[in-house]
Amino acid sequence: MHRQYHFVSDAEAHSLHSVSYTHLTLPTNLFRVIQNNEKLAYLLGRLYLSINGELAFKQNKDRLKGVPNILDDVIETSQIFYDASWEDIQNAAAFLENQVYSFSSTGQTFGIARRDMSQRLPRLMSAYNRIRDAIILHRDYKDVITYAACPGSFILLDPPYKGTEDMYSKANFDIEQHDILFSFMSEVNQQHHGEVKFLITYNNDPYIRGVAEKHGFDTFVQTRLHSMKQSKEAGALYEELLIANYDLEKQAAANHLYLD
């Protein structure tokens, strides 16, 4: 039986298995609240009364300014992890509301389109079932993968896409970090002789595809609907680049899945 880790970093790299340290950052706080069934109950009630208004959006932004969003060294205790506080729930609700109600989910600019928060509540219940036994790590992805990688494990990475680096200013993920990411994962692949499998998702960028292939990784372009463009351009498509250290099509067939 393989252990699974989910980790959260400002660079948005996510691994598969679930063991983590909790930091009082915005995404981490949300995950921690979802994990605790008592907190989740309060959160669902709070979000059910959510108001999609510009004033509420600005109030949430002001609330979240005081919440740290850096890789702090926080010493965890069971009390920190399990204590339910109304402040945690309010911050989690404010963060989720501003992700849903903002333009392009940046949390910074109010989006005019009406959105019903109640439609998101079943997703939170699903998230609870998936991560209730997880520990959420908030560390640099290289530190987490070095710690967690072992034969038989699988790692999923969802880094900032090429051209969106400015949206992750607090993560210090500039354009050079793409090359660093691939070099690091190549080292992981060699160190574990290919017994640690990983999948990286990107936008279909020629430079990224070239770097991936230079390291000998398999690539596949997956076409799907571009959800952010459907209101103005129905049927608009988006090309997602899948990168792995294994044969993607062969593995998909083994799992009775099909890439197109």
Residue ranges of each PLM-predicted region?
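Polar, low-complexity loop segments and adjacent catalytic/binding residues used for recognizing
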Residues: 29-138, 143, 147
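Mobile active-site "lid"/loop adjacent to the S-adenosyl-L-methionine
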Residues: 109, 113, 160-180
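Long, positively charged, glycine-interspersed low-complexity recognition regions
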Residues: 175-260
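Conserved SAM-binding loop of SAM-dependent methyltransferases across substrates and taxa
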Residues: 4-15
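Conserved glycine-rich SAM-binding loop
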Residues: 1-6, 160
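Hydrophobic "anchor" residues on beta-strands that sit immediately upstream
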Residues: 17, 154
